[in-house]
Regions:
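Short capping/connector residues at structural and topological boundaries
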Residues: 18, 25-26, 93, 127, ...
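Alpha-helical packing segments of well-folded alpha/beta enzyme cores
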Residues: 4, 49, 53, 67-70, ...
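CBM-like carbohydrate-recognition segments
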Residues: 88, 100-189
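Extended, well-ordered alpha-helical segments in internal regulatory regions
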Residues: 53-56, 115-117
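Solvent-exposed loop and edge beta-strand segments that line ligand/cofactor-binding
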Residues: 29-48, 59, 63, 67, ...
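Long, well-ordered core segments of solenoidal/helical folds
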Residues: 1-21, 68-86, 129-147
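Loop-centered beta-sheet repeat module
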Residues: 1-51
Length: 189
């Protein structure tokens, strides 16, 4: 697993911005504001996936610190790309081109941050406000019937999604984030 994962990181991880390109075709592309194209949900997959890898590695695994370092590097980029209203957009470095939340991304980011705080990899003082703003933004997108809105449809690049746009992967990410927030609240109470 390590060699394949590291090969992907070497190919798709931007060491300057600490975010991932969706694929090699995206590396030369730029958003309307001239920034690199870092797709929110794609980075959410990685940011939420790293805790699952770390949780399943033995404490003495030689590559464990590699994944922890990657997670904490990404966490800082995730923190910096959060919008003032608490959400993350479909394009992480060009939020003005996509003025609405992208809640599959936002939920994955909240899950990762909550996990990082709970496990001691992210300082609570720095990341708890990010988590709280992110969660509040997600909750505002829950419809009266329980549906979660602002979930970008299946795609391979940033695209806008409205309040009524939903899909199971976004709802699943929201439930994952909520369960991790619950674990975090039990840890600190």
């Amino acid at each position: 697993m390590d060699s394949e994962y590291k090969e992907c990181v070497d190919s798709l991880y931007d060491k300057e911005d600490h975010l991932f390109y969706r694929d090699n075709k995206r590396i030369p592309l730029r958003e309307k504001n001239g920034s690199k194209q870092f797709w929110g949900r794609g980075n959410g997959w990685v940011f939420a996936g790293l805790p699952l890898i770390i949780d399943n590695l033995p404490l003495n695994c030689p590559s464990r610190n590699y994944y922890i370092r990657l997670f904490t590097e990404m966490a800082e980029a995730v923190r910096k790309t959060q919008c003032k209203d608490g959400d993350w957009r479909t394009s992480l470095l060009d939020p003005d081109s996509y003025k609405m939340p992208e809640n599959s991304c936002s939920a994955f980011m909240c899950f990762g941050i909550a996990w990082g705080i709970r496990n001691g990899y992210l300082p609570q003082r720095t990341y708890k406000p990010v988590l709280e703003k992110g969660w509040q933004s997600l909750v505002k997108a829950v419809h009266s019937d329980g549906k979660l809105g602002y979930i970008q449809p299946v795609g391979a690049a940033p695209k806008a999604a409205g309040f009524d746009a939903t899909d199971v992967y976004g709802v699943g990410a929201f439930l994952l984030a909520g369960s991790e927030l619950y674990k975090l609240s039990c840890t600190y109470h």
